[in-house]
């Protein structure tokens, strides 16, 4: 279940706090970490030479149909991404539909 602690609307954009598990198979958003207040994200790429960051940007852009950038945590597993033109409600709806996460 995703709580609002990991999501923040800034103008027309949405900031999302994520925790990345690199080299984990295919891309997915399997759960929400209550303690860290971050959405857990699995990606295929290893954390080498920016491969993981490029995959995060590509997969989020394709999944949500929006431009995405990493705004903090470029060299960390804990990152904050900006999804342009995405509101909180639409994000929660799409995550629920595409990844089956329970939304409060």
Swiss-Prot record:
Signal peptide: none annotated. It holds the Pfam family DUF167. It comes from the Archaea. Gene3D superfamilies: YggU-like (3.30.1200.10). Belongs to the UPF0235 family. This is UPF0235 protein MTH_637. It comes from Methanothermobacter thermautotrophicus (strain ATCC 29096 / DSM 1053 / JCM 10044 / NBRC 100330 / Delta H) (Methanobacterium thermoautotrophicum).
């Amino acid at each position: 279940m995703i709580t609002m602690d990991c999501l923040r609307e800034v103008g027309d954009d949405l900031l999302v706090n994520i925790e990345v598990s690199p080299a984990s198979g295919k891309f997915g958003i399997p759960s929400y970490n209550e303690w860290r207040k971050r959405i857990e994200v699995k990606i295929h790429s290893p954390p080498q030479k920016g491969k993981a960051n490029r995959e995060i940007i590509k997969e989020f852009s394709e999944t949500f149909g929006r431009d995405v950038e990493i705004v903090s945590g470029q060299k960390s597993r804990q990152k904050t991404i900006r999804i342009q033109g995405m509101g909180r409600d639409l994000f929660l709806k799409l995550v629920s539909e595409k990844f089956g996460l329970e939304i409060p």
